[in-house]
Structure formats: C-alpha cells, structure tokens
Amino acid sequence: MEVHELFRYFRMPELIDIRQYVRTLPTNTLMGFGAFAALTTFWYATRPKALKPPCDLSMQSVEVTGTTEGVRRSAVLEDDKLLLYYYDDVRTMYDGFQRGIQVSNDGPCLGSRKPNQPYEWISYKQVAEMAECIGSALIQKGFKPCSEQFIGIFSQNRPEWVTIEQGCFTYSMVVVPLYDTLGTDAITYIVNKAELSVIFADKPEKAKLLLEGVENKLTPCLKIIVIMDSYDNDLVERGQKCGVEIIGLKALEDLGRVNRTKPKPPEPEDLAIICFTSGTTGNPKGAMVTHQNIMNDCSGFIKATESAFIASPEDVLISFLPLAHMFETVVECVMLCHGAKIGFFQGDIRLLMDDLKVLQPTIFPVVPRLLNRMFDRIFGQANTSVKRWLLDFASKRKEAELRSGIVRNNSLWDKLIFHKIQSSLGGKVRLMITGAAPVSATVLTFLRAALGCQFYEGYGQTECTAGCCLSLPGDWTAGHVGAPMPCNYIKLVDVEDMNYQAAKGEGEVCVKGANVFKGYLKDPARTAEALDKDGWLHTGDIGKWLPNGTLKIIDRKKHIFKLAQGEYIAPEKIENIYLRSEAVAQVFVHGESLQAFLIAIVVPDVEILPSWAQKRGFQGSFEELCRNKDINKAILEDMVKLGKNAGLKPFEQVKGIAVHPELFSIDNGLLTPTLKAKRPELRNYFRSQIDELYSTIKI
C-alpha cells in the first residue's frame, strides 16, 4: 500500500493538504502559533531541573550484610566496602595542598583585607614557599621533622594560620590549636599536656598571656613565642627575663629562607592535629587526629555530594568559623585540594556581612546560631502583615520546588523577594553546610528556600573528624542529620537505663571508619570510654533511624547537651552550685539545642523562704511568695551571684527561672528511688513553664 493511500485509510491529511490549510490561516493566528512554539521550546530548554540524587532518597542507608548488630552504611556506596580516599594521590594534608597547586595552576590561594579595602591574595606557590621557610626555620631552631613534634597555634583565622600549618605538615610536625574560649587554666593545661615549647600567636596580647604562665612557673616547657603582628621591644625583654625567645613571624621566615631543608612529608597514619575539646567537666581532652582521619572525612564529603557539587579553582570560601575546630579544618582541606580560594574575615564577627559582600564567596559553612540570627533578622524586617504574608507565600512556593529536588536562585520569587537576602551574602553562594549543633527545621527549611543554594546539614564530633552523617543532594527535608557518610559505618546500641533499644531503631550512635580518631593524648582511661575494643566510637548521642535511612538525633546518653551556639552544658554541675542558695531547696536546670541560653525550675525551701524574703522587704505566705515576681528576680540574682563566684561561664548561667511551690518527689514521679532527678519527666512536667520562659526572655 502506498503512503498516500495509508493517509487516506486513516483519514489523515497528507503534508500537501496541511500546507494548503496553513496558507488559509490568518497572519495573527500563525504568529500566535509561532509564539506558542517558541515559548514552549524556551521553557523546555530553560525549565528548572532537579538535582540528580546519588541514590534512592527513600532508602539512603542500607544494612551491612553479614552483621547482626544493625550496622548501616551509605547507599551511595556500591557495596559494603567503605571509601578510604577519593583521590588516590591525596592521602595527607600535605598531598592535598600539593594537588591544589597543580589544579589551580598556581592560582590565588589565601586572601585577607583591611577595613574598607578589597581582598589581597597570595598564590598557592607563595604559600608553599612561606610554609617551607617556616618549617625549615623550626628545624634550624632544633625542632624535629617528625610526628612526635608538637607545634602550638594560638590565633584567630588568618592566612598565616594555613601557612604555619602547611609548614608543619611539610616536615611531618603536628599542629596543636589553642583558642581563647578555653580559658587561662585550660590553656596552661594544654601547653603542659602537649609539652609545647613553641607557640605561634597572632597578637602581642596572647603572647603576654602565654608569658604569664612561664613567669608564674606554670608552663616551664614553653621556650619560643612567634608573633604574627608587630610588637614592642618591651615584650622581647620580658621574654628574656623568663627564658622565652620572642620572634616575629617574618624574621622566622627569613631564617628559614637562608637555611632551607628538603621537605619530609608525613605518612597517612601520622598525627596531623591534636584537637583539644573543652568538654563539660575536668580538663580538656586532646583528640589525636591523623592525616588519614582528615583526608578520609574529606573524601566522604566529596563522594556524598559529587553528583551535585565538586569544588573548583573558581570557588571561594569565607573562613570565619574557628580553625581550632575540626569542622572548619575539614572544609578548608576540601577547598585547598581542589585549588579553591579561601578569604578570611577581618577577625570581627560584626564585620562579617561586609566581608561577605566584598568577597562574594561561593562556599559558606555556618553554625545554627548564625542561621537563627539571619532568620530573626529577615522576619524582623518583615514588619507589616503584607510583607510577612508575601515572605511566607514566596517561601512556600520555593519550598515546593525544593521538595521536587529543584535548587535555584533565579525564580520569580528570588527576583521579587529573596534577591536582597542572597545579595547580603555576596550574591554568589552555591553551597552552604551547617553543623556543630542542631538547627531548627523551620529555620533550615526557610533558609534553604530563601538562599537558593545547595544547603547541607551534617552531624559528627571531633572524635570522628567533624562528620559522620550528611544530608544528600536532592533531599532538602529537615528534621534529620542525613545518612552515614561513605567513609564510615553507623550502628545504634541499647541504652537500657533510658529505655532505648537498638532493635526498635533507637540507641546510642556509634561510628566506625578511617575517620575515627586514634584516642586522647596521654589519656588511656578516657580513650577507653570513647573507643571500644572493636574500634567503635561511642558518641554519647541517642539516635533514631527514620524510614528513609537517615538518622535523627533525639537525646543524649548522659545528661549533657549543647546549646544553639555549640557549648556543652553539664546541668547537674550547675544545679549543685545553685543549691547553695539559702532560699533554694531544689532546682532543675534546662537547656535546648535550639536555644542560646539556660532556664531553671526552682522549688524554694518552705521553711527558709519566708524569713529570707522578709529580710528583703517581702511579706506573704509561702504560696504568695512563690507567685511574687520580685521574689523570683531576687532568687535568680542570688543564684547568678553564686554561679559567678563558683566560676561558671556566662553561658552556664540561667537567664530566667520559674518558681514552683511543690517539691520534686518519688510520689509525683519526678525523682528516682535513689532521689535522683528524672530529667525527661521533669522536662515534660514543666513543659508549659519552659516554653513560656523561652518565649518571654530576650537576650
């Protein structure tokens, strides 16, 4: 049968008939068809496309075959074998920087700025040159090029930190960071524990603090302080009197330049960093982190996000989170091994927004406290009902796209509503990651929509080199911390006294992989508490597996928790101090990971309160006094005074209290038979008072 006969058979017009029909159409109609076709083609070519997820997002982790303990691994992996290195030639921090030199083609590496000035950059090879000079100078001063040689850094984030760090790694030395918030006693402890004989300090004020320890014979091991900024000769003379050499960083570089030593790079198993964690009780613990630990964790991040993101020399990171913590160290390591640029903030968090506008970063790691401030500021500026409605409406439209896996910053809502928010961060951010403490699902979901970039949430701790779980590309839901990273396994173990059972998908989170640290420096007892005989790290966090294979953190094994800014709180220690208040019989200190401060429920002493109040000019029955707001204020002031005298840090002090007239007891279910507080029951019992305190207190 001929083709034209087939057309007739199916009553379909031949091409010649279609042409004749088209000729009869009016010009306006033809133009309309043409415009519609053009718009359809344009939409198809430019329509927003969902990011391709690396695995089935309904099952992001799978159980490891052959295990009976419910061990799970990332579904991104093809089999049960964990990822060790993403790049075969990058196995140490030194290797990573050398790769950065190559892939960047000696491009800009580290940038800094002075007030009201643009960023000034030094190249990768310039950093490598300075690093070799610093390392060579240390060897000239008698320090050994080996992983038993510890070098202290006491500084804010700045280019010199990376240069000094690379100088240490070039010669297999180990970096020991120090930071202000540890306190003087903790710094003294670390200097002695790590036997630091040389410390690099950014400012003369920190050098003076270190000298005080030597002068008071508290840190006799310290012999050299290298200062980055300019300083007076008085400081040199002061150092000479107690046997400490004060030298400028530039002078040290010059010494190394004329005494160059061939690099002696480290092995993957060698120590890279001793990261001291503040903890809650006792002295800081020095987590021993190897080069393999760091590069393995970096590799896990790269593998988990490779379907949607690979860093490049065009990327720019804003460095403001403390380099003394592993989170920022890992982020910067990922950037450097891809030849990206790192721009440092001016050192003043109040100027961060100005730094962002000038630097225009593409990578922006954050902590929940900053996200909360951004969220509050955005909604604070939406000061009319119309503005608030528009903001809510636009965010809901963007959230709908997120649920479809679409991430973009060029929608109508971005142009009308969110452009100003995005511009405040420089306008070029393409990836954000948050960690260190939990973030509110409301805040995270809104900012994911408003900022229009890939926004990941991670979970981990220093002992697993910052991260062990990470949300995956395409899963922009909140309320979980993602799936196990491709570099480690996760399992949950029973916590019987808290009624958490691994068989029900709840229990203490345990981690195993090449990112798990070697132990605590010179502290076998606490190492044994953290690492079991099979190499599992016990985090102390209680987790729950969700149906999609992601992990949700729901509790702490011990009564220790973090506030929104990441500080650890030991409530029982604080309660024992507050119980010294004459008027207080019982106290329950409470904090939440999404709140920046503590509150407390206080039960006054029924026999003491009336006379205590009378001395302060208050009269009434016990119940009346408990309801008196002025009494509430007086009790709080007395507690805070006791806390200050006992050395509580500002974040350990409660900011508000609710006075309750009835004692916690076994009968009302708030105490155990051994008269210990049942904290979950107390939390639930006083939920309304807790919520009211958090809603009314502004700090």
From Swiss-Prot:
GO terms of molecular function: acetate-CoA ligase activity; arachidonate-CoA ligase activity; ATP binding; long-chain fatty acid-CoA ligase activity; oleoyl-CoA ligase activity; palmitoyl-CoA ligase activity; phytanate-CoA ligase activity; pristanate-CoA ligase activity
The enzyme's main class, written as a single word, is ligase
Q: Where in the cell is it found?
A: Mitochondrion outer membrane; Peroxisome membrane; Microsome membrane; Endoplasmic reticulum membrane
Record has Mitochondrion as a keyword = yes
Positions where Phosphoserine occurs in the chain? S621
Domain of life (superkingdom): Eukaryota
- Catalyzed chemical reaction(s): a long-chain fatty acid + ATP + CoA = a long-chain fatty acyl-CoA + AMP + diphosphate; (5Z,8Z,11Z,14Z)-eicosatetraenoate + ATP + CoA = (5Z,8Z,11Z,14Z)-eicosatetraenoyl-CoA + AMP + diphosphate; 3,7,11,15-tetramethylhexadecanoate + ATP + CoA = phytanoyl-CoA + AMP + diphosphate; hexadecanoate + ATP + CoA = hexadecanoyl-CoA + AMP + diphosphate
Q: What membrane topology is given?
A: Single-pass type III membrane protein
Glycosylation: which residues? S136
Family named by the database record: Belongs to the ATP-dependent AMP-binding enzyme family.
Function according to Swiss-Prot or TrEMBL: Catalyzes the conversion of long-chain fatty acids to their active form acyl-CoAs for both synthesis of cellular lipids, and degradation via beta-oxidation. Preferentially uses palmitoleate, oleate and linoleate. Preferentially activates arachidonate than epoxyeicosatrienoic acids (EETs) or hydroxyeicosatrienoic acids (HETEs).
Q: What is this protein called?
A: Long-chain-fatty-acid--CoA ligase 1
Gene (UniProt): Acsl1
